[in-house]
Regions:
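Glycine-rich phosphate/diphosphate-binding loop of Rossmann-like nucleotide-binding domains
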Residues: 62, 67-177
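Short, intrinsically disordered, charge-balanced linker/junction segments flanking boundaries
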Residues: 181-183
Length: 183
């Protein structure tokens, strides 16, 4: 509320929309853009984690759309991983041998993990084999199945949450790196 009253605040002078009002606003915007510019690319930028994946999934089949946090960051990271493997004399298939620690479970972290996972599966690992090569750490530490993940935006994490016997839920990033030995 203080920000809304700040004379230097350039944003819209009303509280953030939530719930059905938010969903209706996004729907109206998408419909309006598609009616006016049917071939336009709609870029979703800096959406809250609790909305980002849901909105992308809702509209990706009906509109040309892209979420920079989920897809853009992930594409750059995947390209970097492929580039690093090439510099080390490897090939794309070598992604199946990698272990990843992802620091952050927001839109970007989930997108990165998802893209890397898809690349591993495309190179021959089963989905479960690929999931087992990931360690996801958020502000509360390592995420395992001991932690309830039922809030908005948690869907992309579900496959990565494993029954870990090597590290307990909430293990620090340093402890996870030491144990996981990411490549």
């Amino acid at each position: 509320p203080d920000l809304l009253n700040d004379p230097y605040y350039l944003g819209s002078q009303h509280a953030r929309l939530e719930g059905q009002e938010y969903d209706d606003f996004i729907e109206e915007f998408i419909r309006g853009v598609r009616n006016r510019w049917p071939n336009a690319l709609i870029q979703f930028e800096d959406f809250q984690t609790k909305h980002a994946n849901t909105i992308l999934e809702r509209y990706r089949r009906d509109a040309l759309c892209f979420n920079d946090d989920i897809q853009g960051t992930a594409a750059v990271v995947l390209a970097g991983v492929y580039g690093a493997m090439k510099c080390l004399g490897g090939h794309r298939k070598d992604i199946t041998k990698q272990r990843f620690v992802v620091a952050g479970a927001g839109s970007a972290g989930c997108g990165i993990a998802t893209f890397l996972h898809q690349a591993m599966v495309a190179q021959g690992l089963s989905p479960d084999e690929a999931y087992a090569r990931f360690f996801i750490v958020d502000k509360d530490g390592l995420i395992t199945n001991e932690r309830a993940l039922d809030g908005p935006g948690s869907e992309p994490l579900r496959g990565f949450v494993r029954n870990r016997t090597d590290l307990p839920d909430g293990s620090s990033l340093v402890d996870v790196i030491r144990a996981a030995k990411p490549t």
